[in-house]
UniProtKB/Swiss-Prot annotation:
Family, similarity comment: Belongs to the heat shock protein 70 (TC 1.A.33) family. DnaK subfamily.
Annotated spans, Disordered: 642-669
Signal peptide residue numbers: 1-27
Name of the featured protein: Heat shock 70 kDa protein BIP1
Main location per the UniProt record: endoplasmic reticulum
InterPro entries in the record: ATPase_NBD (IPR043129), BIP_NBD (IPR042050), Heat_shock_70_CS (IPR018181), HSP70_C_sf (IPR029048), HSP70_peptide-bd_sf (IPR029047), Hsp_70_fam (IPR013126)
Gene: BIP1
């Protein structure tokens, strides 16, 4: 029997954006359009990038030699910093250093998680059009607001540049991962961040699914049930999958998009803040610099406690010249976070129930995310599965990027025979439906439905002579729409007037291979229909905003380039001046070969240049270049004369002919 909805009732639409079921033919078709496709794990606290190359995955180290990069962005009076450089200066520049932005992306400003985070971070989170924006001072004291997508785009750009430096070519295509329990708005916002970073996001896939690929890529043999337990810096996912000779089928997923290592750090920080207040009668909770130092040391202590039973948290001059030194035991750390650790078991139970499996049917428990190194978390998981040891065979920091890179290899065609049999069957994490009479959430696509999928249901009118139905689309698990999330709405007009219950209106939900949901409503009698793909109804960035942010990102990149050129020009001048200074005083080089006032001329030129450098710390590239030419105009003719007198070829101070022992030019530290 057809269900009814009133003139003002609604149909729920949800868009689930993630990667998915793909047939080999479609992968080959897509590969013809794509270049090399990198895999990026865009994490709350750290990010990682990999590429499928020469038959295997390469996890790519950044310019500091590290395979994971802090998801931090800092602004100073002269430049923008991303990664280690941003994190390292956070303690002295807290209000202008942004981190944990993944906890804001795709959320509304009034979300309770956002309001909680506002009190915990040193930078300002402000309300703009109902969304949380980050307000910071950039160069020259100018205040600017950035969307979470823009900050995420800066991190994605860093990962893109890391891959480009390794591969020696420009990259435009990427697979980007998201927590399995991310809702539609968070997925769409992540895709928008990719666009701002100049990337075509070829696929968004779920982090636990990517990790399962990393675990199961080389696993042959029979069917295996695995549970992926992914506890990272800011988010938590559990997925239950069946792996069978390259087919990865997700049976269920659950999680908490606001639970992770950052929460454990905050508990330790709160403990020490109270201790300081008690011992020193000093409240540091509003002192951003002190909190920055404490945050850094609490994170270090947490990591150390995974392998030690006690650490000492020591911070020189934490506040008012007072040095801080306190022990922290593993037992105390576990006590402070006991409820949070136990909270992770709830989603495990729900995922198991939804998958319809008994504990004994799980063949492997795969640990992903840095927080799974915590012994207490491992113990709780082991106890839940009645003594079964978790598998520690995958690198918890790199597994997600590894799986994303495999997916990238499939999409680009670079995966070849090694990946040709892989098939991913992922699921929609949240139920999608429409509102019917009385505000009831009528489900069309239940959670954990394999995607792509298409579901239709016939509805009817609630009032006599009703000619319009207003359809609202929701996602969520509650029975009433007021407790679910509205994704969008549209009207179907022109229904021929008829008694209530007579018209037949077919509503179709279709989630494609990318997890995008399209909703169509059609009046069967008249053939009149309307379609919707959710876009701006969710507070998503408009195309105009995205275009503006892309332009600004390009301007930032240009600015970063100029800063580097300026530093290089200054270094070139300094190197030349010091090199000349050393040569005129070195008997093995120029000291004994100079005649008349040649030495005085060089010394005067180098002295004047060094004094100019001291007074012009922040000059433009052109000024440094000009000053270098001035010094060279004095020194180079003298050097040429010296070499001609001694029968050698002429050469500048920095030239390879100046002495045989001259080292080749290196960037200075």
């Amino acid at each position: 029997m057809a269900r009814s909805f009133g003139a003002n009732s609604t149909v729920v639409l949800a868009i689930i954006f993630f990667g998915c079921l793909f047939a080999l033919s479609s992968a080959i078709e897509e590969a013809t359009k794509l270049g090399s496709v990198i895999g990026i794990d865009l994490g709350t606290t750290y990010s990682c990038v990999g590429v499928y190359k020469n038959g295997h995955v390469e996890i790519i180290a950044n310019d500091q030699g590290n395979r994971i990069t802090p998801s931090w962005v800092g602004f100073t009076d002269s430049e923008r910093l991303i990664g280690e450089a941003a994190k390292n200066q956070a303690a002295v520049n807290p209000e202008r250093t942004v981190f944990d932005v993944k906890r804001l992306i795709g959320r509304k400003f009034e979300d309770k998680e956002v309001q909680k985070d506002r009190k915990l971070v040193p930078y300002q989170i402000v309300n703009k059009d109902g969304k949380p924006y980050i307000q910071v001072k950039i160069k020259d004291g100018e205040t600017k607001v950035f969307s979470p997508e823009e900050i995420s785009a800066m991190i994605l750009t860093k990962m893109k540049e890391t891959a480009e430096a390794y591969l020696g070519k420009k990259i435009k295509d990427a697979v980007v991962t998201v927590p399995a329990y991310f809702n539609d708005a968070q997925r769409q916002a992540t895709k928008d961040a990719g666009v701002i970073a100049g990337l075509n996001v070829a696929r968004i896939i779920n982090e636990p699914t990517a990790a399962a690929i990393a675990y199961g890529l080389d696993k042959k043999g029979g069917e295996k049930n695995i549970l992926v337990f992914d506890l990272g810096g800011g988010t938590f996912d559990v997925s239950v999958l069946t792996i069978d000779n390259g087919v990865f089928e997700v049976l269920s997923t659950n999680g908490d998009t606001h639970l992770g290592g950052e929460d454990f750090d905050h508990r330790v920080m709160e403990y020490f803040i109270k201790l300081i207040k008690k011992k020193h009668q000093k409240d540091i909770s509003k002192d951003n610099k002190a909190l920055g130092k404490l945050r850094r040391e609490c994170e270090r202590a947490k990591r150390a406690l995974s392998s030690q039973h006690q650490v000492r948290v020591e911070i020189e001059s934490l506040f008012d010249g007072v040095d801080f030194s306190e022990p922290l035991t593993r037992a105390r750390f576990e006590e402070l976070n006991n409820d949070l650790f136990r909270k992770t078991m709830g989603p495990v139970k729900k995922a198991m129930d939804d998958a319809g499996l008994q504990k004994s049917q799980i063949d492997e428990i795969v640990l992903v995310g840095g927080s799974t190194r915590i012994p207490k978390v491992q113990q709780l998981l082991k106890d839940f599965f009645e003594g079964k040891e978790p598998n520690k065979g995958v690198n918890p920091d790199e597994a997600v990027a590894y799986g994303a890179a495999v997916q990238g290899g499939i999409l680009s065609g670079e995966g070849g025979d090694e990946t040709k049999d892989i098939l991913l069957l992922d699921v929609a994490p949240l139920t999608l439906g429409i509102e019917t009479v009385g505000g009831v959430m009528t489900k069309l696509i239940p959670r954990n439905t394999v995607i792509p999928t298409k579901k239709s249901q016939v509805f009817t009118t609630y009032q006599d002579q009703q000619t319009t139905v207003s359809i609202q689309v929701f996602e969520g698990e509650r029975s009433l729409t007021k407790d679910c999330r509205l994704l969008g709405k549209f009207d179907l007009n022109g229904i021929p007037p008829a008694p209530r219950g007579t018209p037949q209106i077919e509503v179709t939900f279709e989630v494609d291979a990318n997890g995008i949901l399209n909703v169509k409503a059609e009046d069967k009698a008249s053939g009149k229909s309307e379609k919707i793909t959710i876009t701006n109804e969710k507070g998503r960035l408009s195309q105009e905003e995205i275009d503006r942010m892309v332009k600004e990102a390009e301007e930032f990149a240009e600015e970063d380039k100029k800063v580097k050129e300026k530093i290089d020009a200054r270094n070139a001048l300094e190197t030349y001046v010091y090199n000349m200074k050393n040569q005129v005083n070195d008997k093995d080089k120029l000291a004994d070969k100079l005649e008349g006032d040649e030495k005085e001329k060089i010394e005067a030129a180098t002295k004047e240049a060094l004094e100019w450098l001291d007074e012009n710390q922040n000059s433009e590239k052109e000024e440094y270049d000009e000053k270098l030419k001035e010094v060279e105009a004095v020194c180079n003719p003298i050097i040429t004369a010296v070499y001609q007198r001694s029968g050698g070829a002429p050469g500048g101070a920095g030239g390879e002919s100046s002495t045989e022992e001259e080292d080749e030019s290196h960037d200075e530290l």
